């Protein structure tokens, strides 16, 4: 990802490209929290500290220089809560907030057909999606593949299809029940996510909102 980011910045003509290691901060946080975490196995908590450190670092630069942080979340991730609150959800604006992951790939491929040379590195498009919080991590270890996930999300969110209707349309029942549950449970994260471009008829935060607590179900 570091090399892909550097190449993308070069292709976009970004001169002030910076790499700021988070390892010292991560080590300091682990040391600070060690007494409180004593006797507990390492888990997602320690992984998410990395994302939150990146978010804190970006917001510090924003604060110091008056820049706005662009959030990288897309609608698929935002829908199911596949994001770290106060980590990769930080930012003042989210360009891809209302764009499903499969459409993001389509946009990348389209963008690379415009102009004299491709802008987005092929590695960004070709490599398996990953939060990169642990070695060999892939999104499809936690979620259905995006070509399976997105049609379920579109049916549930854009077309208000019920669980029985989604299953009747040929989607796997376990996937449907799991995905719709994730969507409902992630409302509290979406309420705290940055504003962004509205692309669909059911943009989160404006056109589609659920209660934060899920006792209504």
Locate the predicted segments by residue.
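ATP/NTP-dependent adenylation/nucleotidyl-transfer catalytic domains that generate, transfer
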Residues: 1-217
């Amino acid at each position: 990802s570091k090399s892909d980011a550097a190449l993308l910045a070069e292709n976009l003509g970004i001169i002030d490209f910076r790499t700021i290691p988070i390892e010292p901060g991560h080590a300091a946080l682990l040391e600070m929290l060690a007494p409180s975490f004593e006797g507990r196995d390492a888990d997602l908590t320690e992984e998410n500290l990395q994302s939150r450190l990146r978010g804190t670092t970006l917001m510090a630069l924003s604060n110091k220089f008056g820049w706005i942080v662009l959030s990288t979340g897309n609608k698929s991730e935002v829908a199911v809560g596949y994001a770290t609150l106060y980590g990769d959800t930080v930012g003042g604006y989210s360009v891809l907030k209302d764009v499903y992951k499969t459409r993001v790939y389509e946009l990348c491929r389209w963008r690379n057909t415009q102009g004299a040379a491709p802008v987005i590195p092929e590695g960004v498009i070709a490599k398996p999606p990953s939060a990169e919080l642990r070695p060999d991590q892939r999104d499809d270890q936690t979620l259905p593949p995006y070509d399976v996930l997105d049609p379920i999300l579109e049916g549930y969110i854009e077309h208000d299809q019920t669980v029985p209707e989604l299953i009747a349309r040929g989607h796997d029942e376990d996937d449907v029940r799991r995905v719709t549950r994730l969507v409902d449970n992630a409302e509290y994260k979406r309420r705290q996510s940055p504003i962004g471009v509205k692309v669909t008829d059911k943009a989160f935060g404006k056109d589609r909102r659920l209660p934060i607590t899920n006792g209504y179900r």
